[in-house]
């Protein structure tokens, strides 16, 4: 039971993790470690003439996150882009044991945690004990999956407070920039069936730990319109 709770707690850490001070040029973005996981390497660079954050994952999982001031950050449209070198064999964001993604853009939302079921609150309490901060009430991810059709909504197999929307799939668009514009509020309603609370954080994540693989991805700016 304790191991199950620990795994579930890891699943809600997209919005809270062990942080290190941000580089001076990171504009508030910070690298975030997940307990017990090797670090994905993030570095500022350029890719095909665009400024980019390069993510290199070798059997690793960690996050690059920016906290937002909820009162000053209305939920609105978002623009983001990514450039993926290759897929991870066997990865599938809907399967517990294969839940890796070459590219994720992540948004954490506030809400009334006391309204959630007791089991969910227990996961949140364990996550807070592991990291020192409370996880978001709800987390929405845009992901690139190896096989799932574009538009698929996935409930995280370990925590239903994390939902994913597949916006790229398969190998056809590899090794080129993919630009996305999404209505964040509409996508939240689609994924969770409720209105979004205040926007608390945004992040990117490339991970390959569950499949013991590797991934290399470049992220363009994540911009709220």
Identify the function of each model-found stretch.
Residues 14-15:
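C-terminal motif of bacterial Sec signal peptides marking the signal peptidase cleavage site
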Residues 202, 221-224:
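Extracellular beta-strand elements of beta-rich domains used
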Residues 2-10:
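Sec-dependent signal peptide recognition
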Residues 100, 110-158:
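Extracellular/luminal beta-rich ligand-recognition
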Residues 67-78, 171-174:
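Extracellular/lumenal carbohydrate-interaction signature centered on repeated Trp-anchored short motifs
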């Amino acid at each position: 039971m304790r191991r199950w709770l620990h795994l579930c707690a890891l699943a809600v850490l997209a919005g809270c993790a062990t942080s290190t001070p941000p580089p001076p040029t990171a504009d508030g973005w910070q690298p975030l470690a997940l307990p017990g996981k090797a670090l994905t390497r993030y570095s500022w660079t350029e890719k095909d003439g665009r400024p980019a954050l390069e993510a290199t994952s070798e059997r690793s999982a960690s996050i690059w996150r920016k906290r937002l001031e909820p009162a000053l950050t209305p939920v609105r449209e978002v623009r983001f882009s990514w450039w993926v070198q290759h897929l991870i064999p066997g990865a599938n964001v809907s399967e517990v044991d294969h839940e890796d993604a070459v590219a994720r853009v992540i948004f954490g939302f506030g809400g009334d945690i006391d309204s959630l079921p007791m089991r969910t609150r227990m996961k949140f309490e364990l996550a807070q004990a592991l990291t020192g901060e409370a996880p978001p009430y709800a987390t929405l991810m845009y992901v690139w999956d190896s096989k799932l059709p574009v538009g698929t909504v996935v409930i995280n197999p370990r925590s239903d407070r994390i939902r994913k929307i597949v916006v790229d799939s398969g190998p056809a668009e590899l090794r080129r920039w993919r630009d996305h514009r999404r209505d964040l509020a509409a996508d939240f309603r689609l994924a969770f069936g409720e209105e979004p609370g205040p926007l608390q954080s945004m992040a990117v994540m490339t991970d390959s730990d569950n499949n013991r693989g590797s991934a290399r991805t470049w992220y363009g700016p994540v911009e709220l319109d």
